[in-house]
Curated annotation (Swiss-Prot):
Function of the protein: Could act as a modulator of transcription.
Keywords: Transcription, Transcription regulation
SMART domains (UniProt xref): KRAB
Residue ranges of every copy of the KRAB-related domain listed in the record: 20-83
Entry-linked Pfam families: SSXRD
Stated family: Belongs to the SSX family.
Feature: compositional bias, Basic residues: 156-167
Single GO BP term: regulation of DNA-templated transcription
Biased composition (Polar residues): 145-155
Name this protein carries in UniProt: Protein SSX4
Region (Disordered): 116-167
InterPro entries: aKRAB, KRAB, KRAB_dom_sf, SSXRD_motif
Gene name, Swiss-Prot/TrEMBL: SSX4
Keyword Transferase belongs to the record: no
């Protein structure tokens, strides 16, 4: 059996795919003039379809997002089917809260590496002062230097050295190198 024949006999869903694309294209075509729409390549049309889908999903999730530029030009109808021109109370509709970076940090906790940088340098991690576990207790006793002071003390003298010198291992056996002279230098 030839592989090309098997591909030709396989059932295809071109009718369903083209129907979905046609509906999506009709949905987007209302934002463009006929001339603009005819000049556009199908790949550009697909990009606009996905831009609109992304806008719809983000607004349904509760994010405050701006309209894509192509949807702003006509302002014909939003994705819910409301007519902007006839809706006088459009501005009075309930706005969803805007997600900020801080609120996202509360939702998704920080992912810490297994070995923080302080532990690699021989320093221990000091827990944060805020939170229900600590209840305002003093984390660093007055006699002990704080983590910041330890970092400043350890990093101060290293500033003059190269950054990679602490990574070099010390040789256990000394190697003595002999200088080889060039015959050209001997002639002089």
């Amino acid at each position: 059996m030839n592989g090309d024949d098997a591909f030709a006999r396989r059932p295809r869903d071109d009718a369903q795919i083209s129907e979905k694309l046609r509906k999506a294209f009709d949905d987007i075509a209302k934002y463009f003039s006929k001339k603009e729409w005819e000049k556009m390549k199908s790949s550009e049309k697909i990009v606009y379809v996905y831009m609109k889908l992304n806008y719809e999903v983000m607004t349904k999730l509760g994010f405050k997002v701006t309209l894509p530029p192509f949807m702003r030009s006509k302002r014909a109808a939003d994705f819910h089917g409301n007519d902007f021109g006839n809706d006088r109370n459009h501005r009075n509709q309930v706005e969803r809260p805007q997600m900020t970076f801080g609120s996202l940090q509360r939702i998704f906790p920080k992912i810490m590496p297994k070995k923080p940088a302080e532990e690699e340098n021989g320093l221990k991690e000091v827990p944060e002062a805020s939170g229900p576990q600590n209840d305002g207790k003093q984390l660093c006793p007055p006699g002990n230097p704080s983590t910041l002071e330890k970092i400043n003390k350890t990093s101060g003298p290293k500033r003059g050295k190269h950054a990679w010198t602490h990574r070099l291992r010390e040789r256990k056996q000394l190697v003595v190198y002999e200088e080889i002279s060039d015959p050209e230098e001997d002639d002089e």
